[in-house]
Curated annotation (Swiss-Prot):
It comes from Legionella pneumophila (strain Lens). This is Orotate phosphoribosyltransferase. Catalyzes the transfer of a ribosyl phosphate group from 5-phosphoribose 1-diphosphate to orotate, leading to the formation of orotidine monophosphate (OMP). 5-phospho-alpha-D-ribose 1-diphosphate binds at residues 26, 72-73, 98-99, 102, 104, 123-131. GO terms for cellular component: cytoplasm.
Length: 211
């Protein structure tokens, strides 16, 4: 496992963003682990999180001008990523959306840079894909071109069909990248000799995994 992935997992554990146990998901599935990026709320952890997103994004060599952060969790994620990119010499603009359209003042649903060029969505996870579809529509309606999606964790899990939501997105020609995925977690736990947790994650993937 590379240093970036292991460092990200350690940070997620330290901030209790990543927990192991028994967690009931919205789908009703009982998951042996849970990831909540909303618990990255200290300044230093947010700074590091932005750096992880920026590094993952630059490694993919995607051509882009804008970052889009879907409300609500995507807003600080995209902002932190833009700051990290600026520190690396890439001055990128940021846009995010409101949940409700504002009818007074500047009005509209978007805040930040106009979405008129190549755009990358920054989010924590993609489960059912609802937020992604809303973001995709907003980007298209405002003249943007969606070039890719960066998320923190790919659960490698299928939805209601045999395919994962990420697979369905990729079938549209849109690539989805993640800082880590389920198999990175399994490798990390193996290296830490946590074989009981490894077995639980592997058993869960046998039931609900997408390949």
């Amino acid at each position: 496992m590379n240093h970036t992935k292991s460092s990200f997992i350690k940070l997620a554990l330290e901030c209790q963003v990543l927990k192991f146990g028994e967690f009931t998901l919205k789908s009703g599935r009982i998951s042996p682990y849970f990831f909540n990026a909303g618990l990255f709320y200290h300044g230093n952890s947010i700074r590091q999180l932005g750096q992880f997103y920026a590094k993952t994004l630059l490694e993919q060599e995607i051509s882009f001008e804008h970052l889009f952060g879907p409300a609500y969790k995507g807003i600080p994620l995209a902002t932190a990523t833009a700051v990290a990119l600026a520190e690396l010499g890439r001055d990128i603009t940021v846009t995010f959306n409101r949940k409700e359209v504002k009818t007074h003042g500047e009005g509209g649903q978007l805040i930040g840079s106009p979405l008129t060029g190549r755009t990358v969505i920054i989010d924590d996870v993609i489960t059912a894909g609802t937020a992604f579809r809303e973001s995709q529509t907003l980007i298209k309606e405002n003249g943007g071109i969606l070039r890719g999606v960066i998320i923190a964790l790919d659960r490698c899990e299928r939805g209601l069909t045999e395919k994962s939501t990420l697979s369905e997105i990729r079938e549209q020609g849109i690539e989805v990248y993640s800082i880590i995925n389920l198999f990175d977690l399994i490798e990390f736990l193996k290296n830490d000799n946590q074989y009981e947790q490894v077995q639980k994650l592997e058993s869960y993937h046998e039931l609900y995994g997408a390949y």
